[in-house]
UniProtKB/Swiss-Prot annotation:
GO terms for cellular component: cytosol. One of its GO terms (biological process) is D-alanine biosynthetic process. This is Alanine racemase. The keyword Plastid does not apply. The keyword Isomerase applies. Catalyzes the interconversion of L-alanine and D-alanine. May also act on other amino acids. It comes from Jannaschia sp. (strain CCS1). Its cofactor is pyridoxal 5'-phosphate. Belongs to the alanine racemase family. The active site is at 33 (proton acceptor), 240 (proton acceptor). Pathway: Amino-acid biosynthesis; D-alanine biosynthesis; D-alanine from L-alanine: step 1/1. GO terms for molecular function: alanine racemase activity; pyridoxal phosphate binding. InterPro entries: Ala_racemase, Ala_racemase/Decarboxylase_C, Ala_racemase_C, Ala_racemase_N, Ala_racemase_pyridoxalP-BS, PLP-binding_barrel.
Length: 342
């Protein structure tokens, strides 16, 4: 049996896409990198394509090849990493559109794949990926056939951060007067308003129900099966390191999931799981394949518990672990059975 069942609410996913799409005046591309933020790129991209999405972004050419096999020849698939050495056959055969990040990538792409579509990523202040402003004047007038000019905001999850306005100004300074379509906003930038929208928005985490899209519908439910329930007496310790000691008689359920499945050790003795409306605290350490949960308050012995679902979002679980919803989502492991609800 799988370590758990990860259910994707396709209706919620599509609703989030359409809500974000209505905010932008131009096109909306779905970001499905990291295996669709951990949910299964094939599942989510197929659902989004049926809902009208025709442009997608992935991190690497290898991800793009897999997506092309699922979606067929029609959609545009863009690659954030650009045209890396060794990627040429993948980009050519899967008809991917790399976002070129440096003069070296521009030279490589135009030399080995002349006439093949490409976009340009510009570094407007994040100092991570993109053509640097000092290198742009020498390239600007040579790249009129680019499909897109894009950049990425470093602080879009904090709308009032001055870095956002600075990057917007830099992006405009680098691209104003060029007829090529432009894109600056992912989920956070989309929510900051029309100044950041340009011709294409690129929502990622907001599609999947994560912050900063506070109005998103929850997309993910993760139910974990109970292997065994035992009664422990006062003074008994639970799990590795004996970090939890029962002070009264407790019913402890052992569940089939652990840090190998993306439930990181930082959740140890901090997370809550749910049996219907009944909260059940995780006790002791998260181990590789197992969790131990106090189910004393459950009316009947549960067969499964929810760690993500109606009572707990990805960001609430992330808060318990001291991390962000992105990490929780993208860590969800391959041992879960993936399922869709319409």
């Amino acid at each position: 049996m799988a370590t758990g069942t990860l259910t994707v609410d396709l209706g919620a996913l599509v609703a989030n896409y359409r809500t974000l799409d209505r905010l932008g005046p131009g096109a909306t591309a779905a970001v499905v990198k990291a295996d669709g933020y951990g949910l299964g790129a094939g599942l989510v991209s197929t659902g989004l394509a049926k809902a009208g999405a025709c442009q997608f972004f992935v991190a690497t050419a290898e991800e793009g090849v897999g997506l092309r096999q699922v979606l067929g020849p029609a959609p545009e698939i863009n690659v954030f990493a650009g045209h890396m050495a060794g990627d040429t056959p993948l980009i050519r055969d899967a008809h991917l559109t790399p976002m070129l990040n440096s003069p070296k990538q521009v030279q490589r792409h135009r030399h080995v794949l002349p006439g093949h579509p490409y976009g340009i990523q510009l570094d407007t202040g994040m100092h991570r990926l993109g053509v640097q402003p000092a290198d742009w004047p020498a390239l600007r007038d040579q790249l009129h056939d680019a499909t897109l000019l894009m950049s990425h905001l470093a602080c879009a999850d904090a709308p009032d951060h001055p870095q956002n306005a600075a990057q917007l100004a830099q992006f405009r300074a680098l691209t104003d007067g060029i007829q090529t379509p432009r894109s600056l906003a992912a989920t956070g930038g989309t929510l900051m308003g029309p100044d950041y929208h340009f011709d294409l928005i690129r929502p990622g985490v907001g599609l999947y129900g994560g912050l900063p899209f506070a109005g998103a519908r929850p997309v993910v439910r993760l139910s974990l099966p109970v292997i065994q329930i035992r009664c422990v007496n006062p003074g008994a310790t639970i799990g590795y390191g004996a970090t939890y000691t029962a002070t009264t008689p407790r019913q402890i359920a052992t569940l089939s999931a652990g840090y190998a499945d993306g439930l990181i050790r930082a959740l140890s003795s901090k997370a809550t799981l749910w049996d219907g409306d009944t909260p059940c605290p995780l006790v002791g350490r998260v181990s590789m394949d197992l969790l131990t949960v106090d189910v004393t308050d459950c009316d009947t012995p549960p067969e499964a518990l929810d760690i993500l679902g109606p009572h707990q979002t990805i960001d609430q679980l992330a808060e318990a672990a001291g991390t962000i919803g992105y990490e929780i989502l993208t860590s969800l492991g391959p041992r879960y059975r993936r399922a869709l609800t319409p």
